[in-house]
Amino acid sequence: MTADNGWLGLNLAREEDWGLLNPWLQQDGDLSEWGHVEDALLGRDAKALVARGRLMGLPVSFLPRKVIAESTGVSEILGGAPVFEFTSDAQATLRHFNTAQSMSDLKVVDLSALWAGPLCAHLLHQCGMQVTTVTSSHRPDGAAQGSPTLYKVLHRGHNHLELDFSSQEDLRRLADLLHNADVVIEGSRPRALRALDLDRDSLLPGGKQLWLSLTAYGRRAPFGDWVGFGDDVALAGGLFCQNKEGTPEFIGDAVADPLSGIFAALAIVKLVQRDASGLLDLSLFAVASHCRKKIHSSGGTMSDEYHRPNLRC
C-alpha cells in the first residue's frame, strides 16, 4: 500500500489486528475494509507508521522508494545479516547418515505453526525423523482452517499432541517432551517460551540438543519482538516484484515462509550430520534478503506481474 515515502506491507490475517488499526493510525472512522485503510495511508509517513505498528505488535513492513528507483535490493535493516546464526555448544564432529534408518532414531518436536516451521518438520520427516507436532488447545494453528489441504500434507505421518499451556501439568509434559527431543522447532518470539521457562537455556543449559528458532526478523533486540508473516517480511527483505506500472507487489504466496522452511531443513540436516548441538537462529527476513541478493547477483529480475495461486497445495 502506498504511503508518503514508500510502501507499506501490512498483514491482517489475525482478526485482532483489525482492532488495532484506529489507534495505529491515530484516527477515528471506519477502517473495516482494505480500501478504507489504503485511503487512510495516503500522505502518511510510512517509516513512522512502521515503527509505531511494530511497537503495537502489528505485522507491518516498509519498502523505501529508493529501493525501487535504484533496484538495489537494499533492505530496511542496514548492514545485512547472515541467513542464519548458529551458536554451537561444542566442536562438531562429522557423523555420516547412509540410510533413512539412521535418521529414524532422531526425535523432532515441532512447536511452530502456519507454514515455515511445519514445512521444515515435514521435510525432516521425509528424511526419516520422528516428528511430534504440539498444538495449543486454546490457540489452534490458523493454517488448519485457512489452508486445510496444505495443513494435512505438512503434518501427515506426524504424532500430534494438544496441550493446554495454562495447565501446569501440561507444561510439565511439554518440558519432558522437549528435554528428550533431538531437534526442537519453534516459531514464537523469544520472550514467549522464556516466560514459561520452556526455552532452551532454561531446559537444557549446554545440553546436547539442536534447537531451531524460526522468527520473522531474528532473535536479537529489537527485532525479536517484531511480528511478521511471509508476505510482509519478504517485502522488508526486498523480495518483491513490480507490475507494469512499477508498483511493488508480493511474490507468490507468503514466499518467505516456504523458502525459510526449506533453508531450515537443509541447515538442520547438515548440522545433524555433524552431530552438532546448539541454537539455530533463522529468520524469514534474512532468507528473503539472501534470495533477493542471489537473484540480482545472477543477473535475474523480479519484474513479472503477480498472479496469486489458487491453492497452496
List the predicted regions and their residue ranges.
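Glycine-rich, charge-decorated loop segments at or immediately adjacent to ligand/cofactor-binding or catalytic sites
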Residues: 220-226
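Flexible glycine/proline-rich, aromatic-decorated loop/lid segments
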Residues: 226-243
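Glycine-rich phosphate-binding loop and adjoining beta1-alpha1-beta2 segment
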Residues: 134-161
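Acyl-CoA thioester-binding alpha/beta core of soluble enzymes
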Residues: 1-140, 168-171, 175, 179-183, ...
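Glycine/threonine-rich flexible loop motifs
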Residues: 171, 188-200, 222
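Adenosine-nucleotide cofactor-binding segment
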Residues: 156, 160-174
